[in-house]
Regions:
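Conserved structural motif at the start of ABC-family nucleotide-binding domains
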Residues: 7, 24-28
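Conserved ABC transporter NBD signature motif
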Residues: 65-73, 82
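Conserved ABC ATPase "signature" region
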Residues: 106, 121-139
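Conserved small/polar residues in nucleotide/adenosyl-binding loops
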Residues: 160-162
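Conserved ABC ATPase signature
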Residues: 117-119, 143-147, 151
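Helix-to-loop junction immediately C-terminal to a conserved catalytic motif
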Residues: 57
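The feature captures the beta-strand-to-loop junction immediately N-terminal to the Walker
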Residues: 42-44
Length: 162
């Protein structure tokens, strides 16, 4: 699976609604992102990096063009399906009180656990594996709101490995 084409972008235009119509942020973006490769998105403030990431993760619709993830159009995914193939770590703080790191990472299993969200033994093993992968075992029982910014980012990384 290494170097498999994972995300393919064709003639993508990003933007958002504004006074007097749609504000175009970037247009005619073509790119291919392959699994197993590090991809870096660089640019000056205000050029549309965050808008592009929000569009790629379906938090906002594209103005034009196409996005395919694993050979399937982004618009053809249900929210539940998308949650199993896309993980996003945002820079904003999540303000969660009364939740441990283990419980938060466990929430990453929600696309797989059914309506009630009860974790099976296999789900709990997956949570523990994700925590171990990011090497945050020492944070497992800490309350999320007590974490430093760096610790919180590591927890969010473990969530996307679920």
């Amino acid at each position: 699976m290494m170097n498999q084409e994972t995300i393919h972008i064709r003639k993508l235009t990003t933007g958002y609604p504004g006074k007097g119509g749609t504000k175009i942020v970037a247009k005619d973006i073509d790119a291919t992102i392959r699994s197993g490769e590090l991809t870096c998105l660089l640019g000056a403030n205000g050029v549309g990096k965050s808008t592009l990431l929000r569009t790629l993760s379906a938090f906002q619709p594209p103005v034009g063009g196409e996005i395919e993830i694993m050979g399937k159009k982004l618009t053809d995914y249900t929210d539940k399906q998308l949650a199993t193939v896309i993980g996003v770590v945002l820079t904003e703080k999540c303000s969660l009180r009364n939740m441990t790191v283990e419980e938060l990472v466990g929430m990453g299993r929600s696309p797989y656990t059914g309506f009630w969200g009860n974790l099976s033994k296999e789900d709990k093993n997956t949570v523990n594996d994700a925590i171990a992968l990011v090497r945050i075992e020492d944070l497992k029982y800490r309350m999320v709101h007590t974490l430093s910014d760096g610790e919180r980012q590591k927890v969010m990384l473990s969530l996307i490995h679920i």
